[in-house]
Amino acid sequence: WKDRNFIFKKYDYEKRSCFSIFSRCCCTCKKNKIEHYSDKEALEFHNSNKSGKIEINSSKPMTSKRDLALAYSPGVAAPVKEIFKNPERAYDYTTKGNLVAVISNGSAILGLGNLGAIASKPVMEGKAVLFKRFADIDAIDLEIDSKDPEEIVNSIKNFAVSFGGINLEDIAAPDCFIIE
């Protein structure tokens, strides 16, 4: 964290506190010169080994039937009941406290313009891996296929409970101000 400049923003969606983290340094620089890559090299990078840049791994051992039973059914019943009694316990028993949603509708992609939600996916995946690499925060990209600010806000409100943070990215003005 000390090598990057981060800005924290707090949101209160129906008494649910969420935070958003934005990093300011996102380019590869050498002595103030940005490195350039060919389109072919960039496409090969994004398609090498597995497509995309994100994968999900278990933080617990999954080597026995017992591990699987604890991770899913019937083992999840105990934390489910605890979270039901006290929703704040979700931070203790789930990834919520270290999980950020990186959200876009693709209406203002990195100087490329309005190319749509699915076209923004490589950028959102890229931001998610920056969170992991530089802050050890797990992040997942969510592309919302809508240009309606109210619909976007409602979508975010509905799934915000799953995340400790929300990062809004590449949403065109003036909608970005309405949504934030």
Model-based region annotation:
Residues 11-12, 123:
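General helical secondary-structure elements
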Residues 6-9, 21:
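Intrinsically disordered, low-complexity segments enriched in serine/threonine/proline/glycine
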Residues 9-11, 32:
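Exposed, low-complexity/repetitive linear segments and helix-based recognition motifs
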Residues 4-5, 14:
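Intrinsically disordered, low-complexity regions of eukaryotic proteins
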Residues 14-23, 28:
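Acidic, proline/serine/threonine- and glycine-rich low-complexity intrinsically disordered segments
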Residues 30-180:
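N-terminal ligand-binding/catalytic initiation module
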